[in-house]
Amino acid sequence: RQRQMCIRDRPFKGVRPPKNLVEQVESRPYDVLNSEEARAEAGDNEKSLYHIIKPEINFEPGTSEYDPRVYESAAENFRKFQENGWLKQDDKEQYYIYAQTMNGKTQYGLVVGAYVNDYMTGVIKKHELTRRDKEEDRMKHVRVCNANIEPVFFAYPDNEVLNELLMRYAATTPEYDFIAPIDGFRHQFWVVSDDQDIATITAEFAKMPSLYIADGHHRSAAAALVGAEKAKQNPNHTGKEEYNYFMAVCFQASQLTILDYNRVVKDLNGLTSDQFLDALTKNFEVIDIDAINVNVSGDEDGIPCYEKMAIDDAISQFGLDILKPADLHSFLLYLDGKWYGLFAKPGTYDDADPIGVLDVDISSRLILDEILGIKDLRSDKRIDFVGGLRGLGELKRRVDSGEMKMALALHPVTMQQIMDIADSGKIMPPKATWFEPKLRSGLIIHKLD
């Protein structure tokens, strides 16, 4: 008889900065900036988490982030931060709430200890392939610090009980509340120390058949692998030790914002622009956009009132992003200073296939591979990717500068599509999702002992 799988999250004694230091300690996640940027952002702030998550900045510029001394320096700094009282461990096992507000929209995450075995058995579901070298780098970091310094980002199906609990806390004064530099988003943080609330959270997660990794596949893999490794090395392993859990922030799926993740390509694979446009007509309806229907009512809740405007007028009045593809299977192409609409013809995709129906897959198969000869998005140097917040202006800039020949804008993937793919055991095509806002690091840390 197969045991019904369920999620086994638990509270933990978080390690975190005192209220008055949080803005000095907190940082962006390790993988959204390079060493030079981290060095510049840390500046002369010795309390910056970058000294732990980008520890190469503690050495001469040019020092490899994979140098053994660099990992050791992360552990030394983690010890130093605790000794100096810049990070302190809570006395009680508890949950935490982390909220982010972007453009007036707030998403509320529960910070939990996720169970390593739930990851190993596939109850925590992934949708991305991980690279062994990147896993190994994160594993070394977890091992040497003996902690999950940065959280991973999970989604769960909407849950009314948890939502009510979150809203109740949202009405109270947060422990941390600040606007982050650079992204300008608001970040708030509450401690859930009430025993009844802790029991409710644990019980509600236990009813869920699965959790979904949204962002942080390499960190999840590394945390789980180190946990499993420690279990093997401990002759008195019970399954209750802290290393059996890793830190995750879990958001309701409907609250998450996924932005478009667009493509820019260096050349047309030997074709002229006319030949390329002609080749597209096999699988797409190609429309030269010289005018666009714009909702000019100005009232989001009211009846939309569309007016046809010349493309240049629409852009000057509403900004370039007014052109973004409004529907699935519609794309925007920028080539030779002009914008084109591409609409995938019926029969070029399979609505029943959770992968084949994705615009990232349609564009990869029918444009990048079939016409442009780009087979592997991860390794081909002719293509690059422009995430979400930079908008269509960045696509136009990179083509107009001559660096790239063409740009392709896609409609964003939905959270439901990600969950469908994870449920079917399939893997998303590369460079498909761009979540925003990103989690800040340094608000909370989970020790493995």
Residue map of PLM features:
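Surface-exposed, charge/polar-rich loops and edge strands
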Residues: 1-4, 8-449
